[in-house]
Amino acid sequence: MRALRAPVLVMGLVLLICTAAQSDASANKVEKTLRRIMEIMRQVENSADDESAQKTESAPEPKDTHHLKTASGETILEIFPRDLSRKEKFITILTGRRLSNPLRHQSCVFETSDLVVFHPSGPLYFGPKCKKDVYRLYHNTRDCTIPAHYKRCARLLTRLAGTRKCQEG
């Protein structure tokens, strides 16, 4: 819509200038004004191109990373916390253990055939039918995305692991 306003505005200005220009003396002013308007339009177009180039540069990576496979051919599900600086705290709460090098571990990798999450009460096993539920719970609930609610997230994952659907397979 913003792109539509600029040409309409320019056309209005050109029409106004053309109707106001009645003598040869004002014709030079009109030409100068038209040149100035054209320069402004070029600047607007260049800035719009620069903005779109910046948006495309910051575009997210392709979804090819979701199709990672293990040596046995099973798909790997990677879970990334929203705030990577809090990764160590999240792992500490869920596992009860500290990571030796938190910068080295950028994601929790789970095999989809048997998802395993380590929890203070022991490891949680998720069957292959539960992959989508674990992914949705981890990424789409505020309990697993807000650092203050990580204990709730651990409780929800524990409850999910106890369901019939996740224990099958």
From Swiss-Prot:
Species annotation: Danio rerio (Zebrafish)
Location of region: Disordered: 45-68
Protein name, entry field: ALK and LTK ligand 2a
Similarity field: Belongs to the ALKAL family.
Signal peptide: 1-25
Function: Cytokine that acts as a physiological ligand for receptor tyrosine kinases LTK and ALK. Required for neural crest cell differentiation and iridophore development during embryonic iridophore development and adult stripe development by acting as a receptor for LTK.
Bilayer-crossing regions: none
Disruption phenotype: Fishes show reduced dense iridophores in the light stripes of the trunk, particularly in the anterior region, resulting in irregular interruptions of melanophore stripes. Fishes lacking alkal1, alkal2a and alkal2b are embryonic lethal and display total loss of iridophores.
GO cellular component, one term: extracellular space
Keywords for the protein's UniProt record, in alphabetical order: Cell membrane, Cytokine, Disulfide bond, Membrane, Secreted, Signal
Subunit structure of this chain's protein: Homodimer.
Disulphides: 130-166, 144-153
Ranges of Basic and acidic residues composition bias in the record: 52-67
Compartment annotation: Secreted; Cell membrane
Tissue: Expressed at high level in the notochord and iridophore stripes of the trunk, as well as in the eye and swim bladder.
InterPro entries hit by this protein: ALKL1/2
